[in-house]
């Protein structure tokens, strides 16, 4: 495909986007449209999106090469989307469009992030661009690099929703969103990736530990909780983004937990990534995204009264890469029960042993954790975990999954049932906070 063909296709794409924008601009805001107006808007967007798909099916590699200067620049997801908005008008939403969307509740948005889903689905499935983007997302974040010298000096970092402490060769990451039971939003994803980067980049760290902190919620006051999953309140008010939460979470810190970090100054001919073993300790519960996390840890410990669940069918969204990994860990039957029917797995039941390595009473869990951390500091652990991961999950398989996930999750994010469920959750929380309607 020559430059003239790409230039012609670029002009056609921009023209189609303008036509779609003209139709939408003549209508009321999304929340105030009649059924007929919603149908008109949907038809205009569908026409433009079909052209975006065809454009990226043909030109994904050329587009990516232009945006990254022939793959000499390592752009992260948000940077790549921003560059695409400027270089290829109409391909993805502009910064102004996204800023306007962020001011609206989920039910009142136009759904421009679906166009980002189209873009990333095609980039990730491209044979050359996909692996390059995957590697770019394994590089340390600029925030982590800024904080690294101080962390190396003090062994401590308070990132807001995550606290990081280095003691005895262990990087201890504590999730401390006590206001929402460690439910994740864009902010926590950024904090988590920064913490994971710091732990991996510190040569004094030999193993990482992730655990939830003590809560202030009346029901769990003074007790540790691992994670309540996605923050549904943030979803309702439009605070969960496709790129900075749903895609960055999977391609960023979760993938780094599995494969390590690619540091530019890590000159090692036999291992370009800095990899370390990881332990997760589940107190209370690991719901949704919390349960997804466990699938990439080398050892999972849990309190005897803890439970795991992936209520994807109830929430209406796709549970990250759990559809990809859970079947490999627990088999197709249990995977379908957990994801499709919302089955809750108690740590004490036999099926939990497919997901949890060791169960302990709450008062014994600290001691069990320390023994596990000591075992994983053996010099041979890193090489053996690398070979196990190589056998269990190839980057090519993960890319294929994430390419499809990018689009399907974007569609789910703006589906009527997800918007309605998030709204009901928010209303329930508001009613509980103001029982007299005040």
Task: Pin down the residues of each PLM region.
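C-terminal alpha-helix plus adjacent terminal tail
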Residues: 1-168, 346, 375-438
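Glycine-rich beta-to-alpha active-site loop
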Residues: 45, 49, 78-107, 253-315
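Short, aliphatic-rich beta-strand segments
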Residues: 169-177
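Hydrophobic alpha-helical segments that mediate membrane insertion or helix-helix packing
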Residues: 173, 192, 210, 293-294, ...
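A structural preference for short, pocket-lining loop segments at secondary-structure junctions
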Residues: 173-174, 191-260, 266-274, 279, ...
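A generic structural signal for short coil/turn motifs at secondary-structure boundaries
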Residues: 180-184, 396
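Crotonase-fold acyl-CoA enzyme core
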Residues: 267-379
